[in-house]
Amino acid sequence: MRQLITYIIFSLSILFTVGVSAQNVTVAHEWNETLLQSIRKDFARPTVHSRNLWHTSAAMYDLWALTEDSASPYFLGNTVDGFSFPFKSFSWDEDPTVQLEEAISYAMYRILSHRFFNSPEGGFAQNRFDAKMSSLGYDITNNSEAFGNGSGAALGNYLGNLMIAYGLQDGANEAQQYQNTFYNSVNDPLVMAFSGNPDLQDPNRWQQLTLDVFIDQSGNEIPFNTPDFLSPEWGNVNHFAIPESEKQTDGNFTFFHDPGPPSLIDPNNIESSVDYKKGFGMVVQWSSHLDPTDGVMIDISPASLGNAGELPDEEQFYDYYNFFEGGDPSLGHELNPVTGQPYEPQMVPRGDYTRVLAEFWADGPDSETPPGHWFTLINYVNSHPMLEKRYEGVGPIIDDLEWDIKSYFLLGAAMHDSAVSTWGIKGYYDYLRPVSAIRYMAEKGHCTDSTRPHYDPAGMDLIDGQVELVEASDPLAGNQGQHVGKIKVKSWRGPDYINNPDNDVAGVGWILAEEWWPYQRPSFVTP
């Protein structure tokens, strides 16, 4: 996992050097933005789109590498994962710019036209690709692969079609719309509109959610309201640079960077379930931070955020995070490295900051899924007028197209390998969402005091002011006292308290724990 993080850090570190050069929008940037816009209109599939971002970035890199004596293509001319990309040579002009831009455009056009053929926006995706080609002055009917005469279009078509063929056998099951081939959930779905979680057979395993209406991350209303596990078999997809020493197999599952099993619950053993209850209990606790009117202000400037040091080992987890107040032991940074001056404080309501974080990683600027968020960030930085494009901040200025292509290659590889590793682990360990665990434990009761009502070893830990029992005089007791003795939590109150999404925030208050929701729309599968 450290190597994956290194790829991300490296791909971003080559960016953050300030200068005064003007930035041009390259053909690579144009096509990447076209891809991001198509992702925003597609089904919300982070795994699929990390792969799209990687394959398109690698194709652009390979074509650029052919123009440089010091560079080598990754796919073209090589056999990758048992798939051959035959190539010998190409006749470049003295200035290869025109041919290269043409080759990039045709390769991108072929790949995107194929990958978004079944997009939920129908023909609008293809219209977008056609329009981009037209704006660049290229003929979309040119499908020749005869690049022997130095045709950039033919070279792009050739590589684009090879990338399509490679993708049809890389383990993603693209030909069957990325459907799962062997995974099945052991639990019946949780119907979110109902209280509790009465049909959870195994409280350590993943559970589908049944929604009244399912609208995915990109705003598409899906014609079924109980979505499957997204990509639990993704560990079987060809990756870029994950060491084989990190590979694990068990039955049909392949996964990498094995972190070991998550915290589990034994419904009959409190002692062995401590970490399970603490982990999901912290989710409930931090959910109480989602009220912008609670008066809690925090500094979100670099003076207070970041510089947290080494991540904790498992046994140090609960000392690393602040269970009650939120946050980690970030020391912040004393000085701005550019100005040499301390950072100005940026005081904001904690409830605004926490909600923005949740909404960004769920929806991002325009719902291009988390892998796409990183490309949105990199495009913003790459286009900034103060960015001076030097490798690690030193040496000569790097050409805009070379800079974009190398940035995309590094970031695309990092996103794809991260997806292969992360979703492979998710699928293998098959762990449940917080909402499944919290509602399950709430329905069981509490595990704090066997002399008090609603005691059960599988129940929640009682915490004064945060997790308590409903008393007869409690507003949550119900008209007939039907909720007396149940568990209540002080938490975000949920979507029932949102009438106008533009203005309402629901706020934080006491709710029945069996009706707990994460901070999310009721039409979207929760984190």
Report each predicted region and the residues it spans.
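Acidic/polar surface patches and capping/hinge elements
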Residues: Q23-P527
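Bacterial Sec-dependent N-terminal signal peptides
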Residues: M1-Q23
